[in-house]
Amino acid sequence: MRIVFGGSFDPVHVGHIILARDVCEHFNAKEVIFVPTYQAPLKEKHKASAQDRLNMLKLALEREEKFTIEDYEIRRKGISYTVYTLKYLKEKYGGEELYLLLGSDSFLKFHKWKEPREILKLAKIIVVEREGMLEKVKEYIKEYFPELRKNEDIFFYKGRRIDISSTE
C-alpha cells in the first residue's frame, strides 16, 4: 500500500513530516507519496511558487527513505484535481492499493471536490482526527457518504497532537 499525501506545502513543515512518518508506520505502508498542488481548487493562491514549494519539499524529505515526491500536479499546471492525480498514480503503480491522507478539516469539504465518488473508487481514505472533530466527521459521513465502511473504505488515525495547520 502507498499513502498519497497531497497539499500545498506552503511551506512544508515538521508537522507534515511527523504526521507522514507516524501514518506510514501505523499503516505499515510501502511509502508516502507527497503530491504538491499546483493550484488547489478550494484554496487561495499560494505564497510561494510551485517550483519553490517543490524545491522546499525536496530539501525537507531528502533523508526520508519511505517518502517520495510526485510532481504530476505541478507538471500538469492549472487547477489540481485529486481524481486525475489518483488515476495517474494507479496507472504508474500498476493498480497498487492507494490510501489518500486527509485532515479532518479537508475531509469535511470532500463532497465539494471534483468527482468524490470516483476518488473513493481509486483510493481508500485515511482521515487524521483533529481534537473534537470525530463526531462532526461521523455526521458528515452519514449525510454525504453513507456507503463508506469504517476500516474498509475509510480509516481514522488519531496521532500525536501537532499544533500546526496550513489552513489556520
Swiss-Prot record:
Pathway: Cofactor biosynthesis; NAD(+) biosynthesis; deamido-NAD(+) from nicotinate D-ribonucleotide: step 1/1. Keywords: ATP-binding, NAD, Nucleotide-binding, Nucleotidyltransferase, Pyridine nucleotide biosynthesis, Transferase. GO terms for molecular function: ATP binding; nicotinamide-nucleotide adenylyltransferase activity; nicotinate-nucleotide adenylyltransferase activity. Its EC number is 2.7.7.18. It comes from the Bacteria. SUPFAM superfamilies: Nucleotidylyl transferase. InterPro entries: Cyt_trans-like, NadD/NMNAT, Rossmann-like_a/b/a_fold. GO terms for biological process: NAD biosynthetic process. It catalyses: nicotinate beta-D-ribonucleotide + ATP + H(+) = deamido-NAD(+) + diphosphate. Catalyzes the reversible adenylation of nicotinate mononucleotide (NaMN) to nicotinic acid adenine dinucleotide (NaAD). NCBIfam families: cyt_tran_rel, nicotinate (nicotinamide) nucleotide adenylyltransferase. Belongs to the NadD family. PANTHER family: NICOTINATE-NUCLEOTIDE ADENYLYLTRANSFERASE-RELATED, PHOSPHOPANTETHEINE ADENYLYLTRANSFERASE. This is Probable nicotinate-nucleotide adenylyltransferase. It comes from Aquifex aeolicus (strain VF5).
